[in-house]
């Protein structure tokens, strides 16, 4: 927070609580129908299609769908359709999941057209009330985040995660996941109270860093790295806790900053162990989601379902990043060279 008050980025991040409440209030009838649509389709394969923050939500969707539904899920590169004009064959039993805030980017629209023409069921998760992407979709799940004024997406990203979780819960008829989502507003309220000032201090003069996650927290790492770049001018690279061991760990020397998100699931112990090893080796390690010896341990919301925990974690990130941006003399609401709606071919 600056002397002039909280940034729009921070205000809108905290509005994610209202988004979670709105989804629980407004979406159940639609979610029930969409869940039945997907069960009737009985997809053999899921393809995600998105850009930017929405593509990080797609990373989350891949993990959750493969864990909860047992369906292989892969990311589609929009340029395959928009630039190279690939014609898909036999997508009749495929769920094509497009995720977008605005639904305006031409490459996503062309990709949805191509997938639907090949027989896929195109389900778009959108924040915009109406858009060209909606017109090319078989069905739409609204994020209901409302207008977002800050260039950096916050509540719409959190809303995307929760909308995906709601969809998967209905599709798989998962009582544990449905119950966890009922508590999502409370989880986000708790996240609003997290104090990550130690993280701001530790990253104040950083130029390069790694952001590490695995499984349910890889999407959190990806989104965090993007926000570090666009609002703080930090060259942050998101990487899996497994992938970093296949070479990239070589640049982690004494004092190298690493932010680690430890998941609250089966992957947690391996990620916490890596964080401990990096700290022991002299890296400046910041951890959210666990207590790691030798690291700066940020507070987190304990006891959350692994599908809900990422939404709470990224809310804490947004508040920290907004404060870090201001502390570095920048404006988190107006990143250089960026616009709210980005259209790519």
Model-predicted regions and their roles:
Residues 4-44, 139-257, 267, 328-345:
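Active-site phosphate/pyrophosphate-binding segments
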Residues 20, 60-63, 196, 317:
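Tryptophan-centered motif/residue detector
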């Amino acid at each position: 927070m600056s002397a002039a008050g909280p940034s729009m980025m921070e205000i809108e991040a905290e509005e994610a609580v209202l988004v979670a409440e709105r989804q629980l209030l407004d979406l159940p009838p639609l979610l029930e129908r969409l869940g039945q649509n997907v069960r009737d389709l009985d997809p053999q394969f899921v393809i995600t299609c998105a850009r930017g923050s929405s593509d990080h939500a797609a990373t989350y969707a891949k993990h959750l769908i493969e864990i909860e539904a047992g369906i292989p899920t892969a990311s589609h590169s929009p340029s395959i359709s928009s630039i190279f004009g690939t014609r898909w064959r036999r997508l009749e039993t495929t769920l094509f999941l497009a995720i977008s805030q605005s639904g305006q980017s031409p490459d996503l629209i062309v990709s949805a057209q191509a997938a639907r023409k090949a027989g896929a069921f195109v389900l778009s998760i959108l924040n915009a009330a109406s858009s060209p992407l909606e017109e090319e979709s078989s069905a739409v799940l609204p994020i209901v985040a409302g207008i977002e004024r800050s260039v950096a997406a916050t509540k719409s990203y959190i809303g995307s995660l929760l909308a995906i979780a709601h969809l998967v819960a209905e599709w798989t008829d998962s009582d544990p996941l449905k119950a966890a989502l009922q508590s999502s507003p409370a989880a986000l309220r708790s996240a609003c109270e997290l104090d990550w000032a130690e993280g701001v201090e530790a990253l104040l003069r950083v130029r390069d860093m790694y952001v590490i996650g695995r499984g349910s927290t890889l999407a959190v790492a990806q989104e965090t790295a993007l926000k570090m770049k666009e609002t703080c001018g930090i060259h942050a690279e998101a990487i899996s806790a497994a992938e970093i061991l296949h070479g990239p760990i070589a640049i982690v020397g004494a004092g190298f900053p690493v932010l680690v998100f430890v998941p609250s699931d089966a992957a947690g112990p391996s990620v916490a162990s890596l964080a401990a090893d990096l700290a022991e080796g002299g890296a400046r390690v910041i951890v959210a989601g666990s207590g790691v010896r030798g690291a700066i341990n940020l507070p987190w919301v304990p006891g959350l379902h692994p599908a809900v925990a990422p939404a709470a974690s990224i809310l804490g990130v947004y508040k920290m990043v907004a404060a870090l941006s201001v502390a570095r003399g920048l404006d988190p609401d107006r990143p250089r060279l960026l616009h709210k709606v980005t259209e790519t071919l």
